[in-house]
Design a protein with these regions (language model features):
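ASCE P-loop NTPase helicase motor core
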Residues: 1-129, 354
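Helicase C-terminal subdomain and adjacent C-terminal extension
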Residues: 50, 54-108, 254, 287-372
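Metal-dependent catalytic core segments for phosphate chemistry
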Residues: 26-69, 159-207, 277-294
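Helicase-core coupling region on the C-terminal RecA-like lobe
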Residues: 110-215, 273-275, 322-328, 332-372
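Conserved nucleotide-binding/hydrolysis micro-motifs of P-loop NTPases
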Residues: 2, 21-22, 44-48, 54-56, ...
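Conserved helicase motor "Helicase C" RecA-like lobe of SF1/SF2 P-loop NTPases
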Residues: 216-266
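Conserved RecA-like ASCE ATPase "motif II neighborhood" in helicase/translocase motors
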Residues: 1-30, 265-268, 282-283, 288-322
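Structural motif
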Residues: 16, 39-41, 186, 240, ...
Length: 372
């Protein structure tokens, strides 16, 4: 790539932009004016520039509560209504719009990934299945085993292509074991969600995560696993939530596990990161409560609590893709299958894990099965 001066300023023969899906339109456009040729690289199936709906609406609510002029208040309320109604459209990155509209002769794509175990790859490859010119679907290929197996299950984790974890816990949760052959697990919980401001929390899922962390902290095989890594990022268990209030709840709970290396955040802030072990808290449920002390009432409600059917943030395929694709060796999903399987992308995830001989679907009542 050459750089040269001209009367209009600096010019480049070629400009390469990476992580372009996270760029705003201005950030994407500005470098283009300096290049004769432009190569824009990104993943149109991941999240756009960070735009936190909760923070956005909370800020608007603050302004509405503090503004003095009637005209300004009316405009802010109008903006809030627009954001709530059109947030899905706002979450489409400029890179995605360009990629989907540009002439096919001007674009290409990588179809192999080398991050994750093939069992995890199977779960996320649906997000990359697009019809080609022959009308046949294609998806994401795991380069660790295709065209040849590079040692993906090699117990020697110094092999850079190994995605073995070696953790063995006989009584992991609800009477089920975790073995070294397990790489994808869905823990199916039935606990209700609760509204906190503009956010959501699920106390039952926090209990499940606490139980899992306790099992890891007591496990000799997990300690041996950690000893194999010099880098703290490799040791860390990543915990991802779709909601900031749930993240905060998990962080408070995790103060009891200071001995464990943990990274806890919302899915948007995990984009671009990876960890060997990832736990995903889905939060949303098919039942909802208004108070954390609310008890089930089966005389009034079939499921004990009022029903709800909204997936909220979790309905975004790009957000789900980011959450599930952070893991290299072990992915644990904690969520209510009765709600999420109503949407095909989640039903696919569930069925892929269920059909995998080494996958696990574990039914769990977080108030009974793990809190006796």
């Amino acid at each position: 790539i050459t750089t040269y001066n001209c009367k209009d300023g600096i010019k480049f023969s070629t400009v390469i932009q990476d992580e372009s899906s996270k760029a705003t339109p201005a950030e994407l456009a500005l470098p283009l004016v300096y290049g004769e040729k432009n190569i824009v690289i990104g993943d149109h199936r991941q999240l756009p520039p960070m735009l936190d709906k909760e923070e956005f609406i909370n800020t608007l609510d603050f302004l509405i509560d503090n503004v003095t002029g009637e005209s300004e208040m009316k405009q802010l309320r109008k903006l809030k209504t627009y954001v709530i109604k059109n947030f899905d459209e706002m979450e489409i990155s400029h890179f995605q719009r360009i990629y989907e509209s540009i002439d096919p002769s001007l674009k290409g794509k990588f179809t192999r990934q080398y991050r994750m175990h093939p069992d995890i790859n199977e779960v996320i490859k649906q997000f990359y299945e697009e019809k080609d010119d022959n009308d046949s679907a294609n998806g994401l290929i795991c380069g660790l085993i295709d065209p040849i197996d590079l040692g993906v299950n090699d117990p020697d984790m110094s092999n850079p292509f190994s995605r073995y974890h070696g953790i063995q816990i006989d009584d992991f949760i609800c009477g089920e074991a975790l073995s070294a052959n397990n790489h994808v697990i869905w823990i199916d919980v039935n606990s209700p969600e609760m509204i906190e401001g503009t956010s959501r929390v699920n106390e039952g899922e926090v209990n499940v995560i606490s139980h899992i962390l306790k099992k890891f902290s007591e496990s000799d095989s997990f300690k041996q696993y950690c000893d194999k890594w010099a880098d703290e990022d490799d040791k860390e268990i990543g915990i991802i939530s779709f909601y900031s209030k749930q993240r905060n709840k998990i962080r408070r709970m995790c103060k009891s596990f200071n001995d464990l290396p943990l990274k806890i955040d919302v899915v948007d802030r995990f984009q671009g990161m990876e960890r060997n072990i990832i736990i995903v808290s889905m939060v949303r449920s098919n039942t909802i409560i208004s108070d954390s002390q609310q008890q089930p009432d089966y005389s009034e409600y079939e499921l004990g609590f009022p029903e709800q059917h909204d997936l909220g943030f979790a309905q975004s395929p790009n957000r789900l893709n980011v959450a599930l694709s952070r893991s290299k060796r072990l992915l644990i999903i904690i969520g209510n299958s009765e709600l999420f399987r109503q949407k095909s992308i989640y039903d696919n995830v569930y069925n892929i894990i269920k059909a995998n001989p080494n996958g696990k679907i574990i039914k769990c009542n977080p108030y009974e099965d793990i809190c006796k």
